[in-house]
Amino acid sequence: MFNGAILVGAGERQGGDPFHAIHPATGEKGSVAFSSAMPDDVAEAAALADAAFDSFSTLAPDARATFLETVADQIVAIGDLLIETAMAESGLPRARLEGERGRTVGQLRLFASYVRLGDWLDATIDSAMPDRAPLPRADLRRVNHSVGPVAVFGASNFPLAFSVAGGDTASAFAAGSPVIVKGHSAHPGTGELVARAIQAAVKACGLHEGVFSYLPGNNRALGGALVADPRVKAVGFTGSRGGGVALMKIAAERAEPIPVYAEMSSINPVVLLPGALADRAAAMGTAFVGSLTMGSGQFCTNPGLVIALDGPDLDAFVAAAAEALSGAAPQVMLTPGIHDAYEKGVAALESAEGVTTIARGTEAEGCNRGKAAFFATDSATFGANPLLAEEVFGSSSVLIRCSSIDEVIATIAGLEGQLTATLQLTDADSADAARLLPVLSRKVGRILTNGWPTGVEVTHAMVHGGPFPSTADGRSTSVGTLAMMRFLRPVCYQDVPDALLPAALQAVSYTHLRAHETPE
């Protein structure tokens, strides 16, 4: 169960200004009063995380992997209470949340298997060359170390997979970093249940209590205090551009600046090339609406921009999309605030000069329902009005009608950084696609063809990141095993006796951990 507690290390406490979850499907206030963490809670959690760092960061890979698996087991053990709580607090349906729970525990287990493999250590040996002329070479050995305690901010749109035990937490644990989670106020009961599962896993594995703390709250000062604490060495964040940039500013102004790995804003352009439009315009129109309206459009990979050459084939796409979208029933949005922001964003597009409304979804019945919207404009209007390139979080998208492939390329070149870009194409479009790919690769973290961007697999190869403002640092990803690298840094050991080296660099570990050795 949950009781609205703050979880600092192995303990729990009440305190701070109380707040309640708002159930978006009904607008009702939840019955449990949740405590808001205070500055003293932040300081104690950071002190415990700092105290836990040495033992946790040097934990043997197998023991760390076992901890990740134990977290997964503890989450599964919560049972249906977790799903029912998340349904009430998020308005998301059961099937979606059951799938998200599977993704969350699967992600933890993937990191466990990767930790055991040891490749992430990147153990590298340049053996001594004492007889080299004119100067001998020292014995040099490099291995990755954890950066230190990590602050993680839970996201609103994935109460399980991008929240307390989501990808940021899983990858930080995998890297050997203690974690302090700032819980999201939209789903505090869900967050506390998962936090208690992690707390139980820490105890079951005999780890230092400071490996994990959970700080609920509904004010920005809490997050700012957490990022400003000198014992925190990195930040994982998924949320709005404004929130992410605010945390980046705090982190940059510290005496010791730290990285903020913030996933923020993306409209994920979809380019419909002429061959694809001639081949399957109507089918693409219907499929596009399915992607746009999935989960009320509350995905960071939602297809918020469509770019295509004007003409009869594009008209066929638009007709099919309009028909599908006109019958789309409004869905519950995650919070009243998100719904209000969506309505304001759609209203701004409806009133923008040079923008026409292609279609709207059916009328909403009940509170906090998002009515889907599809708009159209031309490339000149789009380029002249920055508002049209801003993310509207929800089932809203803008079509840009272009007169040439050069205009398509110029439009893409003018975009900000994005998480994804999609090319709908056939073999007949190869020449155009070849021209587009270099431009797209400068703008996005993931390029896909003949699909839709909303699904993000948790794998070794996945990149869920992109240039600013889609993320704070386009060299990283928040999904997949590569996400560990955000919380690791290389350390080189020169002429250090074997017995004093980290285990991965000792002679007994060479073959097991696949150390790389520079040839003479």
Regions found by a protein language model. Give the residues of each.
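Structural signal for hydrophobic packing residues in well-ordered secondary-structure cores
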Residues: 53, 57, 72-79, 83-86, ...
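C-terminal core of ALDH-fold dehydrogenases
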Residues: 365-370, 405-501
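NAD(P)-dependent aldehyde/semialdehyde dehydrogenase
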Residues: 286, 308-419
